[in-house]
């Protein structure tokens, strides 16, 4: 069977099968499995995500309606009970590992792409995904509400996930920050909710930079003024030392505080950073880039299935979110390698009803005809190479 004959299999081909099987082996995903392998389960999850199915029954019915095309996509028939069992029992850490493998490939492809700044830009934020507490009783968030939280480290240069961490909704953002801000030599952009001076100092000690907004109750003393244009948006640029009883101990070094006036929104912002070499305008521009992570959260919630779930256990919910994140990176890889100018949203709209068609994502986006059929006898040479 030609693994590149359908849109779905072509997209999946950007995922290393050997790295996938390594993740399965590491977590014993196929131990005792008789019918549905973890890889086939993953492809069914892909199908459900990309076709916009709200339930397992809908996935099953959709695949039945396309049963004659399943072979070319390398998909077996879906049995609802087997699929639901896999949702509950296949360790979600398998798909977390696969996500990291796909991210590594994306970073290799990005290579030495032009960066906005000298250091790589990483945007940190978290988004709440609401759940019905009566169905997801393990996900208690507030009195009558359940939720999980997606903590994300977004590659600010390529606008794709770089790292992620999933937790129950109660987990504070700062804990996610500790999980995601471990890389040296980068610039982390953080919302004001992440201002924990001990955690910020950990970033400093790792040899990285941060840009965030200062809390209104922060106590400090001015050490010196940095020169800046009086007629521009920079109101002030000063070096400060924290003076609070706890904050002075938690962050003993000096910080830089930039006050910036946004003419468009008629609002003044105060940023703090441990970077003393970038211009004040660059500091403001870096923080403005934080909006990209909000756009990503909006995109993934609107285009992939991470608000309605096909299982009720923590493992099932986390598995579904990891698969959505994997697909977001695979779409970026596909767009980049094939030079597709269409947005990820436009691509998803085109492939939603053509997943099992004999075509490629590139063919869909450029209106080119699919490649000619390759018969099994010709595939012998592919196996021998």
Descriptions of predicted regions:
Residues 1-62, 90, 94-101, 115-137, ...:
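Single, function-defining residue in the core of a domain
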Residues 64-73:
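Extended, structured, electrostatic nucleic-acid-contact surfaces
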Residues 72-90:
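Major-groove recognition helix of helix-turn-helix-like DNA-binding domains
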């Amino acid at each position: 069977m030609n693994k590149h004959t359908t849109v779905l299999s072509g997209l999946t081909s950007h995922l290393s099968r050997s790295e996938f099987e390594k993740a399965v082996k590491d977590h014993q995903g196929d131990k005792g499995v008789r019918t549905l392998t973890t890889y086939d389960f993953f492809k069914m999850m892909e199908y459900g995500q990309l076709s916009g199915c709200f339930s397992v029954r809908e996935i099953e019915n959709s695949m039945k309606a396309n049963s004659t095309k399943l072979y070319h996509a390398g998909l077996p028939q879906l049995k609802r009970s087997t699929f639901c069992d896999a949702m509950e029992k296949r360790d979600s850490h398998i798909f977390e590992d696969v996500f990291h493998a796909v991210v590594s490939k994306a970073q290799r492809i990005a290579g030495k792409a032009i960066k906005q700044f000298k250091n790589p830009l990483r945007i940190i934020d978290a988004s709440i995904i609401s759940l019905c507490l009566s169905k997801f009783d393990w996900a208690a968030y507030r009195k009558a509400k359940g939720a999980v939280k997606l903590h994300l480290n977004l590659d600010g240069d390529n606008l794709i996930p770089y790292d992620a961490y999933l937790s129950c909704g109660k987990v504070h953002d700062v804990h996610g920050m500790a999980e995601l801000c471990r890389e040296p030599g980068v610039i982390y952009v953080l919302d004001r909710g992440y201002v924990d001076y001990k955690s910020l100092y950990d970033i400093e000690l790792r040899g990285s930079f941060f840009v965030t907004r200062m809390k209104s109750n922060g106590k400090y003393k001015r050490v010196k003024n940095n020169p800046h244009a009086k007629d521009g948006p920079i109101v002030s640029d000063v070096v400060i030392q924290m003076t609070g009883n706890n904050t002075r101990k938690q962050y003993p070094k000096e910080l830089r505080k930039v006050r910036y006036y946004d003419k468009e929104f008629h609002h003044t912002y105060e940023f703090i950073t441990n970077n003393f070499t970038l211009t004040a305008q660059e500091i403001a521009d870096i923080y403005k880039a934080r909006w990209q992570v909000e756009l990503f959260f909006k995109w993934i919630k609107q285009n992939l299935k991470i608000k309605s779930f096909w299982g009720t256990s923590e493992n099932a919910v986390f598995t579904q979110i990891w698969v959505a994140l994997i697909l977001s990176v695979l779409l970026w890889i596909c767009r980049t390698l094939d030079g597709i100018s269409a947005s990820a949203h436009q691509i998803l709209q085109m492939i939603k009803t053509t997943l099992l068609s004999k075509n490629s994502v590139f063919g869909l986006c450029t209106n080119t005809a699919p490649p000619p059929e390759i018969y099994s006898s010709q595939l012998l040479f592919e196996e021998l190479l």
